[in-house]
Amino acid sequence: VSSAVTPLEIDIRPLEAGDLDAVVELSLRAWAPVFASVQQVLGDAIFLRLHPDWRATQAEAVRSSCRDEERDAFVAVAHGRPVGFVTIALNAFHRGMGAIDIIGVDPDYQRRGVGSRLTEFSVDHMRRRGMDIAVVETGGDPGHAPARAVYDAAGFTLLPVARYFRLLR
């Protein structure tokens, strides 16, 4: 028995208002292990000050990014339902730079090429819209390792950044 998983047939299309609840729900399930990893790295005291209710904050961040007129939002659809999404900011940080703002894949569909397809779609979208550079940011903790692997495979160059935290009280 092979451990390889067959890539999933998906369509990527602009996100519609009716997709938003499903996208928020899948994003929360997708990021649960990521936030758990961040909590393990930072410890409870710092994590809970930064993210007292990460689910509510993250749900609002996804809704806001998807509704933002300054962003382009797309959804990956398989079997008639959203299985992933991405929001893209054009001229982010610098003129001519496009950014993958938020990207997420339903855990039931991870490791089937959805994140890679959304990333490549995003890069192509930025190129078509006249961007010269694409950027994406992610964490350096173990929970973000799958995302880093996707961006490495997509040809992004890593710029290591260090962010330190210290509890003051």
Region spans (language model):
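Terminal substrate-recognition subdomain of acyl/acetyltransferases
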Residues: 2-6, 153-157, 161-169
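Acetyl-CoA-dependent GNAT
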Residues: 10, 14-101, 106, 119-120, ...
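Short, flexible, glycine-rich and Lys/Arg-enriched loop motifs at helix boundaries
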Residues: 39-47, 136-148
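Flexible, active-site-proximal loop/turn residues at the rims of small-molecule/cofactor binding pockets
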Residues: 92, 109, 140
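Conserved acetyl-CoA-binding loop-helix of GNAT-fold acetyltransferases
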Residues: 105, 111-124, 149, 153
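Accessory recognition modules or surfaces
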Residues: 112, 135, 143-154, 169
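Short phosphate-binding/catalytic loops that engage adenosine nucleotides
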Residues: 114, 131, 156
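Conserved GNAT acetyl-CoA-binding A-motif
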Residues: 126-139
